[in-house]
């Protein structure tokens, strides 16, 4: 997944979806930023960025920002689409013990009363269906050494909706799981960011009381093949 990436230095992120980077030869390149969040601490000018190349000729921007290597020495996966890809691989390999033992793994299944799609629906004979909602976590707050991660990094009405849907599934007798995919190498634990989204934090507590299970998954962010 993180193979054949190229390195540059971040100049700036702007318009949410764009970033300017400086290549090793001094040239400036505009790349696609696949992250709609605030990206606090993930997009500081001067940080190293690692980007992938697409062969899709229809794309306006050929290059995609995948990873940040911070001045503090942490790896961050800023491409939020990678969270589900990493979790999918982990589920198929039974790497997440709490979610192992299911024979069927389906992605993007419609469910709930608010027109949602669950990231993963796990099923097996003699087991309740398990609804798994994945959220990528990259917000590491001060003091950094404590490793406290928070979600979300900004107000998320979509995230609030997903918590309501998980509560509903649990009330119907299914298993409901909120899985934080920790995509920041400095984060050691995750909690709801009530200082950024009060409503989400309230729903998070309601969900836990209703029996929604909360887990963290820490995928390996080492890079097997890097090209400078």
Curated annotation (Swiss-Prot):
Pfam family, one: SfsA_N
GO molecular function: DNA binding
InterPro entries to which the protein is assigned, alphabetical: SfsA, SfsA_C, SfsA_N
Protein family membership: Belongs to the SfsA family.
Entries under NCBIfam families matching the protein: sfsA
Name this polypeptide is given: Sugar fermentation stimulation protein homolog
The organism's taxonomic lineage, starting at the top: Bacteria, Pseudomonadati, Pseudomonadota, Gammaproteobacteria, Alteromonadales
């Amino acid at each position: 997944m993180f193979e054949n990436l190229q390195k540059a230095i971040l100049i700036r992120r702007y318009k949410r979806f764009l970033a300017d980077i400086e290549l090793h030869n001094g040239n400036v390149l505009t790349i696609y930023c696949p992250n709609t969040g605030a990206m606090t601490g993930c997009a500081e000018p001067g940080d190293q960025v690692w980007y992938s190349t697409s062969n899709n000729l229809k794309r306006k921007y050929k290059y995609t920002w995948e990873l940040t290597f911070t001045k503090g020495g942490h790896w961050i996966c800023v491409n939020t689409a990678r969270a589900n890809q990493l979790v999918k691989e982990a589920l198929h390999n039974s790497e997440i013990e709490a979610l192992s033992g299911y024979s069927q793994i389906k992605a993007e299944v419609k469910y709930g009363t608010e027109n949602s799609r669950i990231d993963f629906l796990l099923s097996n004979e003699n087991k309740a269906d398990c609804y798994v909602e994945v959220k990528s976590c990259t917000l590491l707050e001060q003091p950094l050494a404590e490793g406290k991660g928070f979600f979300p990094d900004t107000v998320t009405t979509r995230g609030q909706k997903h918590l309501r849907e998980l509560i509903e599934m649990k009330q119907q007798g299914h298993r409901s799981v909120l899985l934080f995919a920790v995509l920041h190498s400095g984060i050691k634990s995750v909690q709801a960011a009530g200082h950024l989204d009060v409503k989400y934090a309230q729903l998070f507590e309601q969900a836990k009381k209703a029996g929604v299970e909360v887990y963290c998954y820490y995928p390996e962010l080492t890079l097997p093949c890097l090209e400078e």
